[in-house]
Amino acid sequence: MAEITASLVKELRERTGAGMMECKKALVEANGDIELAIDNMRKSGQAKAAKKAGRVAAEGVILARIGAGFGVLVEMNCETDFVAKDAGFLGLANEVADFALANKGTTIETLAAQFEEKRAALVAKIGENMNIRRVQYLDGQVIAQYLHGAKIGVLVAGEGSDEELKKVAMHVAASRPEFVNPEDVSAEVVAHERQIQIDIAINSGKPKEIAEKMVEGRMKKFTGEVSLTGQAFVMDPSQSVGDYLKSVNTKVTNFIRLEVGEGIEKVEEDFAAEVAKITGGNA
């Protein structure tokens, strides 16, 4: 039997919105497998949908640069929001972004090695750890960028108007699509969601044959919700992003979105202590 820790219960609660006791029970039944617990909770109706793993917790900045036929996003992390606004920290982050632009295709390992001496000196001066965490490139005929308070960075590649692509970049920042078009959703993702929807229908009392027919409509809705062109456009929810792009004769070929601290968990001692009481004190 896997150990059900407070941090595991906390993560499941944040991803599903379910209560602590429900989350602990689901984890026990799934032997500590959080993804299986989420699937089981969705099938039983305890959770309508689960957020993707990776809570935004670390501080830092996202910087963007545009070159000839490509763009690059760089994430640099620190421990506090105060340091994220420090001139020395921002100066180093901008140096890193400029280097990434001038040396297309550079890896995170190369960036770390290139700036290690300056990073270490700044850590010693400020007294707070920091690191260059991610670098991602995007090629395209036209590249548009959008930065939301230096915390979220988006690059959109496409054909047509740079102005229209920037509007789409703002949409990507707000709506977090995972794919460009509904047909781009991988077969594995579709099969997994289809089975969950079938089980939900069967558990509600529908015969298997009817459940399988019902799922087709739900799957079309699902692939639309996770794809850029299938989502309702944030600037005009009456139409999809795909319809909007057609109306302005613009096409999106790809995009990337980075948010500061994705996948890094900040310790929240008060909440963890609360959960620990339920799980018997395991952290």
Curated annotation (Swiss-Prot):
UniProt keyword annotation of Cytoplasm present: yes
Q: Where in the cell is it found?
A: Cytoplasm
Please provide the record's keywords in A-Z order.
Cytoplasm, Elongation factor, Protein biosynthesis
Q: Which PROSITE patterns match?
A: EF_TS_1 (PS01126), EF_TS_2 (PS01127)
GO CC field: cytoplasm
Q: Which SUPFAM superfamilies match?
A: Elongation factor Ts (EF-Ts), dimerisation domain, UBA-like
A Gene Ontology molecular function term for this protein is: translation elongation factor activity
| Pfam families attached to this UniProt entry | EF_TS
Protein biosynthesis among keywords: yes
Q: Where is this region: Involved in Mg(2+) ion dislocation from EF-Tu?
A: 80-83
Q: What does this protein do?
A: Associates with the EF-Tu.GDP complex and induces the exchange of GDP to GTP. It remains bound to the aminoacyl-tRNA.EF-Tu.GTP complex up to the GTP hydrolysis stage on the ribosome.
Family annotation (NCBIfam families): tsf
Family note: Belongs to the EF-Ts family.
- Can you say what this protein is called? Elongation factor Ts
Q: Which organism is it from?
A: Actinobacillus pleuropneumoniae serotype 5b (strain L20)
Its gene is tsf
